[in-house]
């Protein structure tokens, strides 16, 4: 326990929190270009082929980003928007693709949670 005099001289050291998405550099999203689009397998006990892309961001960072939703149109040199948010069963994947912006199309025939997948509202007649 420090004395009052020690606190006057030094003060309390504030704990610095480590960012969970350092490549964004405190921005909500970042633009980038896909350098590789591929599938990878999750950790045990899950089993699937998860769609991911390696993206070079405008600030020079190269990150792995998850492509959510069913089906996508991304390939090498696609310009994409990245947001934070990790995928628990994919080690090293700390970012998500924003669907429906830039070169990334929204998910087709999506009825629920449309805003998360960049899907427009379906016509009432159909």
Swiss-Prot record:
Gene Ontology CC terms: small ribosomal subunit
PROSITE patterns listed in its UniProt record: RIBOSOMAL_S12
InterPro entries per record: NA-bd_OB-fold (IPR012340), Ribosomal_uS12 (IPR006032), Ribosomal_uS12_bac (IPR005679)
Molecular function GO terms recorded: rRNA binding; structural constituent of ribosome; tRNA binding
Region (Disordered): 1-26, 103-126
Residues annotated as transmembrane: none
Protein family per UniProt: Belongs to the universal ribosomal protein uS12 family.
Protein function: With S4 and S5 plays an important role in translational accuracy. Interacts with and stabilizes bases of the 16S rRNA that are involved in tRNA selection in the A site and with the mRNA backbone. Located at the interface of the 30S and 50S subunits, it traverses the body of the 30S subunit contacting proteins on the other side and probably holding the rRNA structure together. The combined cluster of proteins S8, S12 and S17 appears to hold together the shoulder and platform of the 30S subunit.
Protein name per UniProt: Small ribosomal subunit protein uS12
Gene that this polypeptide is encoded by: rpsL
